[in-house]
Structure formats: C-alpha cells, structure tokens
Curated annotation (Swiss-Prot):
InterPro entries: Enolpyruvate_Tfrase_dom, Enolpyruvate_Tfrase_sf, EPSP_synthase, EPSP_synthase_CS, RNA3'P_cycl/enolpyr_Trfase_a/b. The gene is aroA. Pathway: Metabolic intermediate biosynthesis; chorismate biosynthesis; chorismate from D-erythrose 4-phosphate and phosphoenolpyruvate: step 6/7. Monomer. This is 3-phosphoshikimate 1-carboxyvinyltransferase. It is found in: Cytoplasm. 3-phosphoshikimate binds at K22, S23, R27, S168, S169, Q170, S199, D320, K347.
Length: 434
C-alpha cells in the first residue's frame, strides 16, 4: 500500500494560499452551465470532484474551455443538449445530487453512477422530492441509493415540494438550483423542509450563488423556501471561487499547534462558507486567531501551559471542519465532546467510526455515539501510528496534524487527498519544521 511518513515536527509557520472551494466550484460550474451567456470562473478548484463535474458537463454538451484554474463556460440557457448520457461521478456528492435534479427535468435518458461508496450514500430523499413534480427516476440496485436511471417525464408543480433536511443539505441544494428551470402556474415554487435542516451554511452558499446568477430565493426561516419558476439563470460574466474554508482548517490548526505565525489566504470575514466558523471554535480552545476579509492568522496558543482548552460544542453547522477539531482535541488538556455530527456517517466514509478507530491508534480514549464523539487525549501521543484513511480526503489531511505533536505518523493511501486538495502534503511540508 502507498503511504507517507510525516514528522516529527515541532513547529509550523508561513503563508498558504488556499485552492478554490469544492462546494462553490461545483455549484458555480452547474449554474454557469445552465445559465444564459458565457461565464469566466477563476480560482476553480482542480481536484477529483471538480473533474467529474467538468467531465459530466462536457458529456452533456456544455462548451468548456479550461486554462489552469480558469474555466470559461458557455451556458446552455437551461437545457443540456445531450439527451442520452452515462455519467460516472466518482464519490462527488456535490456533483451527483445537483446533477440528478437538473437531469430529471431535462427530458432525456440518463444513467448516474459512481464508485462503490457513492452507491452507499443516500439519495432517496432527493428522488422523493423530484418524484413529487413528476420526475421518472429508477434505482438500479438498492432502493434509495445510486446508481440511478433517469427518464423523460412530464414535470409539473401543483403543490409545495416536501424534502427531508436531516440527512444531507445537498438534497435541498439540488432542488433549489433546479426548480427555476421548471414552470409553475403562479410563477413560483414552494419547498418545505421536513425535520431539522442540517448544515445550514451550505444552503446559504447555494442561495447566494443563485443570486449571483440572477435568481433570488426567498426563505422563511430554514423550513420554507420560495423559488421563482420558469426563469433563466444569467451569467454574471466573471466569478471568482473563494478559497476552501474546510481545507483552511488544517492549516489554522497547524498554526495553533505549531506556534505559527501562520497565515491562510483566500478566506476570512467576507467568506460565504460556514466553515470559516472553525476559526471561532479554535479561538474557544485558546488559539491566537486574527481575521481579515480574506485572510486568517494564527499565532500559537494563548495559554501558559501551551495546550488547547477542551471544547464541548454542537458542530451541526460545520461538520467537515469539525473533523479537524477531533484531531486538535488530542492536544487539549482535558476531554472534548463533538455533538450533532450524525451527518458524518453518510459522508465519504462513516467518519464517526473511522475517526474513533484512528484516534485510538495515537493513544486517545474515545467514546463514540450515534451522533457524537468524546475525545480524551493521551498523556503522550503514540509514535509511528499507521493511519488508515478510508478513501476519505479529510481523514488523511486531519491526521497530518499528529506529526506536530513531536511524533512521526504514517498516512496510508495519501493520494486520497486528490478529491479536494491534490498537493496538500506538499503545502503542509512547506510549513512544518522539525
């Protein structure tokens, strides 16, 4: 098996410019493809997840011109020209869910599938929502999961669409992005969320980006959304993808654990991503954090004892960045509790189980619940732990931080970071020092 040995490191400092946000990149690509006009996207993330979206859009007849991190997309004015396609979407939830919705109203015959793990990630709530407006979608293997067959359908809206919000916010995102393409009698479509909506900041990203493309969604709290029907997205001309706030979390934690000063460029106060909230969680743990509009500085830990304070927090709003807190908790002077993280179980892997298993390898005492994780750090980290990564980019990036505890650590299958951050380990090595 491929592996990478890191550390031991005693400090981390320097400046890192973040790659583009995965969540924003794939949303903007789809919106630009559906819009009227030509859109120039800058700072587009180059990763496995964006490549599968680009490949799919190309297969569907969208004209794309890429040059480095810039992509010029010629919009299709709301309808893909290819009426049959077989689309392989890897393990990219940000591609599978929104594309499924867009294809369901496109009047074609499509197959949507991915890697084996994608076929274990739920999509039933989205399909149920789309069937309410007449979409013809069949499951090829297991009810509620990809692969999917999508067929031409008579789409009509005559009542509010109901969708569950407690498994993944991507189901609601997919509906919101697609419904402007659908006609309705009174010119608007209502979406009602059943249960508590998780990961609300990701819905905020969706609504803000739709607005950049000329479509305004009204919302009543987080339970009711009103979407204009039968309208056209319009290209904003140019749009820049801000840095990936989830990816920022590893470097911000490194700046705390490794003393800093460490500056992350590309996200800050002006970010539309909820995961910048990670900086506040890190501050609660005692890190010295300063934030500008598009940068964040971290300069070590503000306690004389040099350890982070333990944290007990609800991480429903920032589930991806919360993984970094679980590893940072190894460096706290007490027990930390991460609550309301049930969504971890349906991500790239079952992240609660994976995180519990790997934290134990470095000596932590772990209590794992259906939607929580309790981390008690060891007196001393176990050196030379071989960390399994479960084909999950975030597991690999999180556990790189163990090397800042003065012990070497082995990361198995390090190339899995290609999903969102192909050169992560090069960037990390440039900042970490023995």
């Amino acid at each position: 098996m491929d592996y990478l040995d890191l550390g031991p490191y005693s400090s981390a400092s320097g400046t890192v410019r973040l790659p583009g946000s995965k969540s924003i990149s794939n949303r903007v690509l789809l919106l630009a493809a559906l819009a009227e006009g030509e859109t120039t996207i800058t700072n587009l993330l180059d990763s496995d997840d964006t490549r599968v979206m680009l490949d799919a859009l190309g297969t569907l007849g969208v004209k794309l011109a890429r040059d480095g991190d810039t992509c010029v997309v010629t919009g299709t004015r709301g309808a893909f020209t290819a009426k049959t396609a077989d689309l392989f979407l890897g393990n990219a939830g940000t591609a599978v869910r929104p594309l499924t919705a867009a294809l369901a109203v496109n009047g074609g015959d499509y197959r949507v599938h991915g890697v084996p793990r994608m076929h274990e990630r739920p999509i039933g709530d989205l399909v149920d929502g789309l069937r309410q407006i007449g979409a013809q979608i069949d499951y090829e293997l297991n009810e509620g999961y990809p692969p999917l067959r999508i067929k031409p359908a008579n789409i009509s809206v005559d009542a509010p669409i109901r969708v569950r919000g407690d498994v993944s916010s991507q189901f609601l995102t997919a509906l919101l992005m697609t419904l402007p393409l659908v006609k309705a009698k009174d010119g608007k479509i209502v979406v009602e969320v059943d249960g508590e909506l998780i990961s609300k900041p990701y819905i905020d990203i969706t609504i803000r980006l739709m607005e950049r493309f000329g479509v305004t969604v009204e919302r009543d709290g987080w339970q009711r959304f009103v979407v204009p029907a039968g309208v056209r997205y319009r290209s904003p001309g140019r749009i820049m993808v801000e840095g990936d706030a989830s990816s920022a979390s590893y470097f911000l934690a490194a700046g705390a654990l490794g003393g800093g000063p460490l500056r992350v460029e590309g996200v800050g106060r002006a970010s539309i991503q909820g995961d910048v909230g990670f900086a506040n969680a890190l501050m609660q743990m005692g890190a010295n954090v300063t934030m500008g509009d598009d940068w964040i500085d971290v300069r070590g830990i503000g306690h004389d004892h040099g350890k982070l304070e333990p944290i007990d927090m609800d991480f429903n709003l920032i589930p991806d960045a919360a993984m970094t807190i679980a590893v940072a908790a190894l460096f706290a002077n007490g027990t930390s509790t991460l609550r309301n993280i049930a969504s971890w179980r349906v991500k790239e892997t079952d992240r609660i189980a994976a995180m519990a298993t790997e934290l134990r390898k470095v000596g932590a005492i772990i209590e794992e619940g259906p939607d929580y994780l309790v981390v008690t750090p060891p007196e001393k980290l176990t050196p030379n732990a071989a960390i399994d990564t479960y084909d999950d980019h975030r597991m690999a990036m999180c556990f790189s931080l163990v090397s800042l505890g003065g012990v070497p650590v082995r990361i198995n299958d390090p190339k899995c970071v290609g999903k969102t951050f192909p050169d992560y380990f090069d960037r990390f090595a440039a900042l970490a020092k023995a």
